[in-house]
Amino acid sequence: VFNVSFAASGYIPALLILAAFIPFVWGLGSIASAGVLTFRRGSGAIGFLAFALTFTSGAYFPLALFPSWVAPLASINPIGIAITGMRAQLIGGAGWHDALVTIAKLVPLSGITLLLGLYAFRLAMRRERRLGTLGLY
């Protein structure tokens, strides 16, 4: 399809990049859960954040089309980092060095997001228990 060939040597590095990215998603989910617990709403804010991250990831069109002030923000977007790294492995035939550079960028971002998410969820649960409103769900 579309005259694209996948590099078999990129499967394992792409899976490792995906594994480094997954904790970021868990962290976002925990932050979203904490927001819903605390405010009884949050789908609008969560949807906007997901839209902003996805829109600036380069998944739908090249980042070069963005204004110059968006480029620095897009360069630290974990979704964009993961997509670019996996594309390079599967389609571009990039090597292990490129995969390790991508993983080195993703691990701190994923770790920080996961820790923030767990902390936010813990605070939200503590608040709901203290107020006695956990049973409202």
Where are these regions (language model features)?
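Junction motif at the cytosolic side of a transmembrane helix
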Residues: 108-137
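Alpha-helical transmembrane segments and their short interhelical loops
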Residues: 1-46, 97, 101-118
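Transmembrane alpha-helix boundary/anchor motif
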Residues: 26-30, 61, 65, 81, ...
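Membrane-water interface at transmembrane helix exits
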Residues: 2-3, 32-36, 87, 91, ...
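Short alpha-helix boundary/capping motifs
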Residues: 63-64, 84, 101, 110-115, ...
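Transmembrane helix segments
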Residues: 33, 37-80, 84, 88-89
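Generic anion/oxyanion-binding catalytic loop in active/binding sites
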Residues: 71, 93, 113
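Flexible, active-site-adjacent loop/turn segments at secondary-structure boundaries
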Residues: 4, 59, 64, 132-135
